[in-house]
Amino acid sequence: MAASVRQARSLLGVAATLAPGSRGYRARPPPRRRPGPRWPDPEDLLTPRWQLGPRYAAKQFARYGAASGVVPGSLWPSPEQLRELEAEEREWYPSLATMQESLRVKQLAEEQKRREREQHIAECMAKMPQMIVNWQQQQRENWEKAQADKERRARLQAEAQELLGYQVDPRSARFQELLQDLEKKERKRLKEEKQKRKKEARAAALAAAVAQDPAASGAPSS
């Protein structure tokens, strides 16, 4: 109580020290509202568009009630608007059953995906030993082929040196031209040998088939 009295006295003292021509602050009175609803002129181009729709009518009815002249039934949404609102609500605010079903479908899809991935991994692991064997065999074949090419090229170079003489530089154009000619003949010879082996294999297969079915070979031709 004593503290409030001292505070009041200090405020009075401050007011007494003000200049004679000064006065205390006085707020303006709040603007007076019109006693009734205000309806904008639809012909006025400066009228905001939202004031010409049902939203503004709803505000006037909420403020003035029946004095606004708004029919309450006109504020309800139309059947089409209700359907749109219901569709929007179902999309953004689904029911608990819908959310549970969506979660169940998602979990089933994830489980199916996991099982397929595990099955794929198991199949790959089962194929891994054979894949390693095939890879090792391929590496061995590549190495053997590289060694054979290296030996063949060394043999052709030695043959070219015997034909041209050992004093000829292997980097010379004459030596390289002869080496290319020898390689061409070598490839032709290998191709002919391969074709010959294929013909011999076909002939052997035909002879084996005839030997297994002698009746067919001895049948008279019409």
UniProtKB/Swiss-Prot annotation:
Annotated Gene Ontology cellular component terms: mitochondrial inner membrane; mitochondrial large ribosomal subunit; mitochondrial matrix; mitochondrion; nucleoplasm
Pfam families per the UniProt record, alphabetical: CR6_interact
Low complexity bias locations: 203-212
Organism annotation: Homo sapiens
Coiled-coil intervals: 99-212
Expression by tissue: Widely expressed. Highly expressed in the thyroid gland, heart, lymph nodes, trachea and adrenal tissues. Expressed at lower level in liver skeletal muscle, kidney, pancreas, testis, ovary and stomach. Barely detectable in adrenal adenoma and papillary thyroid cancer.
Native organism taxonomy: Eukaryota, Metazoa, Chordata, Craniata, Vertebrata
Record text on subunit structure and interactions: Component of the mitochondrial large ribosomal subunit (mt-LSU). Mature mammalian 55S mitochondrial ribosomes consist of a small (28S) and a large (39S) subunit. The 28S small subunit contains a 12S ribosomal RNA (12S mt-rRNA) and 30 different proteins. The 39S large subunit contains a 16S rRNA (16S mt-rRNA), a copy of mitochondrial valine transfer RNA (mt-tRNA(Val)), which plays an integral structural role, and 52 different proteins. Interacts with GADD45A, GADD45B and GADD45G. Interacts with NR4A1 via the NR4A1 AB domain. Interacts with ATAD3A and ATAD3B. (Microbial infection) Interacts with the human papilloma virus type 16 (HPV 16) minor capsid protein L2.
Motif Nuclear localization signal: where in chain: 184-200
Keyword Metal-binding: no
Biological process, per Gene Ontology: mitochondrial translation
Note: Cells overexpressing GADD45GIP1 were more likely to be in G1 and less likely to be in S phase and grow more slowly than control cells. Inhibiting the expression of GADD45GIP1 promotes cell cycle progression.
UniProt name for this protein: Large ribosomal subunit protein mL64
